[in-house]
Amino acid sequence: MQNFKELGISDNTVQSLESMGFKEPTPIQKDSIPYALQGIDILGQAQTGTGKTGAFGIPLIEKVVWKQGVQSLILAPTRELAMQVAEQLREFSRGQGVQVVTVFGGMPIERQIKALKKGPQIVVGTPGRVIDHLNRRTLKTDGIHTLILDEADEMMNMGFIDDMRFIMDKIPAVQRQTMLFSATMPKAIQALVQQFMKSPKIIKTMNNEMSDPQIEEFYTIVKELEKFDTFTNFLDVHQPELAIVFGRTKRRVDELTSALISKGYKAEGLHGDITQAKRLEVLKKFKNDQINILVATDVAARGLDISGVSHVYNFDIPQDTESYTHRIGRTGRAGKEGIAVTFVNPIEMDYIRQIEDANGRKMSALRPPHRKEVLQAREDDIKEKVENWMSKESESRLKRISTELLNEYNDVDLVAALLQELVEANDEVEVQLTFEKPLSRKGRNGKPSGSRNRNSKRGNPKFDSKSKRSKGYSSKKKSTKKFDRKEKSSGGSRPMKGRTFADHQK
């Protein structure tokens, strides 16, 4: 494989790349960089995690002219992605004096205006805030020679298609090189390409080892009122390193996050009403392993570039194929394996079939874990935790209590009782989730049927979405089993029947 030097990259940039651990270009970088250096328009179809930031960012650094003034503009769908792209560009150009500025909403515009006045060579921003600066004339386009649209389909999904068109129209076509990257190519993006790009070089890296996500896709059939308990059982059995859980609404995300926390899981939520400061705090916790479960809506998760996500759970099934593709694309990145589990109500199976038909592959049916499997997983987890606890020095007062208990009770029975409380602790916590109606069945035309009842009050005769709430598993009562003081334990309980659950961890 070619190295960066052979692609025409300067020694300074190669040195920066090597210091970052990049010895060889990824497939999309190898295919894109030569054309990008020549000023040719590029249409790249690639997912996050394939090295596409380097595909446009490295040649961008190489083309910087050493004078003040914006020369390159990069559009990104979210603040988080804009910041990530900007940080990578700074790393690529370390020691070369390239100034990179980010502009996005949720932050004081005055500070951004001040930064733009210093004449940065590269600006990375979200469409809305870029337009604000264009209208204020604090961002000038006369010196811009390169325009990048990163995750264009995400920007389209977020309603930025007209904003993208407005911005592209502001930069003279004669001087503009355009590079557009997108995981999918919907018709609106194709129209944008035809209108604003000049015979672009088409580069696809969707089917190579690096960019083809190695994701095991499953669906599990479960009723709404049983969904939360089934979900937490999967969490206990799978033991995900990092997991993203998708809910359909902000309310769902809030309630699901609270329910998980009450059950002892390390979780945080993200949706459109979360402040920018809180978003950054949550993402920092997720990346630093302070939490391992991120609950999010589709909009809130767009543009997130988080490595190491082992599992994606679609707590609520997405309404379209593109949303499904973007959701599960959060795992299985950069050649790593991932697991995606979609929870589906029996009447929503048409949506599973639609996704399968569109993607050309089948999902595997996955039965919910049996109680025996869940308890076994919890026991294994408790064993590991106990080993960690034993390595720590206990407080003297706890040692005193331990001695008193051991003098009073049989040691095996005592430990067994404590472990039982730990293993079954989650079962005693009662949670409440607002009942969400399943998606409507699809008609023959592929659209939801029964639309005439959309505004009717009929709904579900048994559960009204406004007044009824589903409770988490709470039928398991606290054990009333007593143990005799200083008497021998009398064997274990009878094992439950059932097949062994296939633990799909990597």
From Swiss-Prot:
Intracellular or extracellular location(s): Cytoplasm
Principal location: cytoplasm
Domain Helicase C-terminal: 214-375
EC class (word): hydrolase
Annotated positions binding ATP: 46-53
GO process terms (BP): response to cold; RNA catabolic process
Reaction catalysed by this enzyme: ATP + H2O = ADP + phosphate + H(+)
InterPro entries hit by this protein: DEAD/DEAH_box_helicase_dom (IPR011545), DEAD_box_RNA_helicases (IPR050547), DEAD_helicase_CshA (IPR030880), Helicase_ATP-bd (IPR014001), Helicase_C-like (IPR001650), P-loop_NTPase (IPR027417), RNA-helicase_DEAD-box_CS (IPR000629), RNA_helicase_DEAD_Q_motif (IPR014014)
PANTHER family, alphabetized: DEAD-BOX ATP-DEPENDENT RNA HELICASE 47, MITOCHONDRIAL (PTHR47963), DEAD-BOX ATP-DEPENDENT RNA HELICASE CSHA (PTHR47963:SF5)
UniProt similarity note: Belongs to the DEAD box helicase family. CshA subfamily.
Protein name: DEAD-box ATP-dependent RNA helicase CshA
Protein species of origin: Staphylococcus aureus (strain bovine RF122 / ET3-1)
Gene it is expressed from: cshA
